[in-house]
Regions:
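A conserved regulatory-domain signal marking ACT and ACT-like small-molecule sensing domains
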Residues: 1-132
């Protein structure tokens, strides 16, 4: 069964350039912060980052030293079985309630679970529905 919880995600945008991901991850590493999930992409020469970490305060401070201004956003983290159809079950619960999914990113591995991060039009309601 999927388990959902509210998280505070850090996000920021910067002009894209070679080596930016390495700089960001080195800065976070220097603060001894673990990155739990990460989505990064380029659009129109800008780099967009969304990440969840084990210490937002430490990560924000480390990134500020690099001149990066971050913002915190509420997101839904969902841990689910790494099996065929699990994401469909979760997304159907959200859709059936009329909740819009603004974006999703996730990770799977060879283990028994995967994690997806959602931003929805009603995170609180989505968490309740997923945890039923």
């Amino acid at each position: 069964m999927a388990k959902a919880k509210k998280l505070k995600q850090l996000s920021f945008t910067m002009p894209n350039r070679a080596g930016l991901l390495s700089e960001v991850t080195a800065g976070v590493l220097g603060a001894k912060v673990n990155i739990n999930t990460l989505c990064a992409y380029e659009l129109e020469n800008n780099a967009y980052f969304m990440l969840t970490v084990d210490s937002n305060a430490k990560a924000k401070k480390a990134l500020a030293k690099l001149g990066i201004e971050t913002k915190e956003e509420d997101v839904v983290a969902v841990e689910m079985s790494n099996r065929v159809g699990e994401l469909e079950k979760v997304s159907k619960k959200i859709a059936d309630a009329g909740i819009n999914i603004n974006y999703i990113y996730g990770t799977t591995g060879t283990g028994k679970s995967s994690i997806c991060v959602f931003k929805t039009s009603d995170n609180t309601k989505a968490i309740i529905l997923i945890n039923k």
